[in-house]
């Protein structure tokens, strides 16, 4: 289903190295011509220092098995440059005792003072570490790169011209080494930096757009990600505005997160509003499924869209791991919505709405009742499901109120900040004539 594939869009907002997992994922699908896809991977990997990956891709394209002369020369140059950079940071590597001291590492000034006192540390060593980290990353040695990037974050001042690059590099390296806990910490650190930096409006919008795309990789792989993606994308006005302005296709991932997060059903109402607002700029089976179900109450349409959703998710690298969960929770949403309208339902009717056989539908409902997720009774003789009342719990009501107030508070804070900046700018402009 190439018409709903987002890889070509998502890759525009990802670092070159972060695109490789997405492109390799597509190689296992029948969406695009395999030859053209491998040729694109080869052209992309040539722009890095990943010589082995380049040779592997050439073999997959049935090109010459022997390493071309330019690659032989590039490999020699890479090894020589690595050796030179490693020699430049050698004084830092002698400071292993300090690097292992957690208390010293917590305080940047104490750490730098100890390095200067005991190891004759100079700022030139810091920039050598930065260059080595970047070079290791370009070579695909992400794990080793993170060590030097971490060192740079501790020593480097936030005002340093390379500080933002280090934040981005650290996040990318942690994602590529699948260190999701650390990646989440780096994501939070980077978001705080972007939100508090003195960027122009356009620069801030661009930075947030990139961060949104990178964060999807983290959120769908971290245990807390399903809550955090909703908080960031739906309830932080600056990021919701970035999605609506620059990347409405991210609605797919926000919608998926809400569907598979049963504890955040209160977010559905706010999500549906945004989906309706953005329906003229972006639609796909996942957003249309929610529209069919909660706006039009079109159960037949929702059933058909759910079938399309499975194909979309199966071919989307970001959310493919959520496929079974999505189908299960989407069926539950259809069932719950249908039950709000009908107090008594035949199992055959329900099976039709859920794309299931009658005996499968009956077993599915029995499991829901057994797991205390459904207040209902089954009349096996008549083949009916009789619903009980399902009031919203006090906890769910409280969470819904808190989310609503939080969103309004952030919106007001953003409005006040913008007005304050505008007022200060007007004050500055008024002095230009004196």
UniProtKB/Swiss-Prot annotation:
The reply on keyword Phosphoprotein is no
A GO term for molecular function: translation initiation factor activity
What GO CC annotations are associated with the protein?
eukaryotic 43S preinitiation complex; eukaryotic 48S preinitiation complex; eukaryotic translation initiation factor 3 complex, eIF3e
A Pfam family annotated for this chain is eIF3_N
Under the heading InterPro entries, the entry gives: eIF3e, eIF3e_N, PCI_dom, WH_DNA-bd_sf
Domain PCI, by residue range, is: 219-392
Annotated localization: Cytoplasm
Write down the superkingdom of origin. Eukaryota
Task: Say where the protein is mainly found.
Answer: cytoplasm
Which keywords appear in this protein's UniProt record, sorted alphabetically?
A: Cytoplasm, Initiation factor, Protein biosynthesis
Any single biological process term in GO = formation of cytoplasmic translation initiation complex
Keyword Protein biosynthesis part of the UniProt annotation: yes
Q: What does this protein do?
A: Component of the eukaryotic translation initiation factor 3 (eIF-3) complex, which is involved in protein synthesis of a specialized repertoire of mRNAs and, together with other initiation factors, stimulates binding of mRNA and methionyl-tRNAi to the 40S ribosome. The eIF-3 complex specifically targets and initiates translation of a subset of mRNAs involved in cell proliferation.
The similarity annotation says: Belongs to the eIF-3 subunit E family.
Assembly, per entry: Component of the eukaryotic translation initiation factor 3 (eIF-3) complex. The eIF-3 complex interacts with pix. Interacts with mxt.
Q: Under what name is this protein listed?
A: Eukaryotic translation initiation factor 3 subunit E-1
